[in-house]
Amino acid sequence: MTTQLDALRNMTVVVADTGDIEAIKKYQPQDATTNPSLILSASALPQYASLIDDAINYAKAKSTDKAQQLIDAEDKLAVNIGLEILKIVPGRISTEVDARLSYDTAATVEKARKLIKLYNEAGINNDRILIKVASTWQGIRAAEILEKEGINCNLTLLFSQAQARACAEAGVYLISPFVGRILDWYKANTDKKEYVPNEDPGVISVTSIYNYYKQYGYQTVVMGASFRNIGEITELAGCDRLTIAPALLKELQESNADLPRKLDYKGEVKPKPAPLTESQFYWEHNNDPMAVDKLAEGIRKFAADIEKLEAMLSTKL
């Protein structure tokens, strides 16, 4: 019998949304994605102790300044975890820029170059790395610069059509439109508390973005992210990529239910519209209260987890 996971792999690149190396070995995804929250949870696992020690030693050798040591240790730990994952996945690892830089184009570019340099020094070429950046206007501009330097980017915390359009117009390699967090917002802020998968507002958002990209011939990869249940995943079967947490990969592997393709644009390709200006971007994005709330909340949450990671690392410096 074909499992749903195998069926999904036949139409969509399956990516593991985890920093847990054992889970990645088990489900054999093409790529893996990490973020500050996943790095924080992974760093608590005993098998990662040596990676933390290596990051601490690296930071101490680079600088005597405590603040700089903390920054260097964080960056090195994220890359160390990425390097371990790259021993298992045949494709790419996504490593995230510090969320506290989300509104600073120059600082985001500088941090991305540093992360790439650490990977390159470990013998990993750019074509196996995606730099994750929050989909703010400033982050999108940073990604535009990085893409021209041959550094491919994964634009995350993407909730609005305006964000998706601006990313495509900037020539970004890949976007991660969120599904589950959109559902969370609608459940919390409207009277409707239950959704069937094809009416799930997160599913509708990603479907709309996917069709828009195909309709206008944008090459940017659409990788649905942040899932709350397998119904959301099966409704997006056929999406370019889906990044899925281990618990949901397990559910897909244990199911033999039929999995028809849902996303498959067959229409004509139209001429691309003129790119959004900064003011148009903000107008359109800010007209979506869900997107405004979830982008800001996502940046705050990642920043808080970075600070927790720093607190742990600082005890070792």
Swiss-Prot record:
Any single GO BP term: carbohydrate metabolic process
Which sites are catalytic?
Answer: K132 (schiff-base intermediate with substrate)
Metabolic or biological pathway: Carbohydrate degradation; pentose phosphate pathway; D-glyceraldehyde 3-phosphate and beta-D-fructose 6-phosphate from D-ribose 5-phosphate and D-xylulose 5-phosphate (non-oxidative stage): step 2/3
Keywords associated with the record: Cytoplasm, Pentose shunt, Schiff base, Transferase
In its UniProt record, a GO molecular function of this protein is: transaldolase activity
Top-rank taxon of the source lineage equals Bacteria
Q: Its quaternary structure? A: Homodimer.
User: What is the name listed in the Swiss-Prot or TrEMBL entry for this protein?
Assistant: Transaldolase
> What organism is listed for this UniProt entry?
Mannheimia succiniciproducens (strain KCTC 0769BP / MBEL55E)
Give the organism's phylogenetic lineage.
Bacteria, Pseudomonadati, Pseudomonadota, Gammaproteobacteria, Pasteurellales
Name the gene behind this protein.
tal
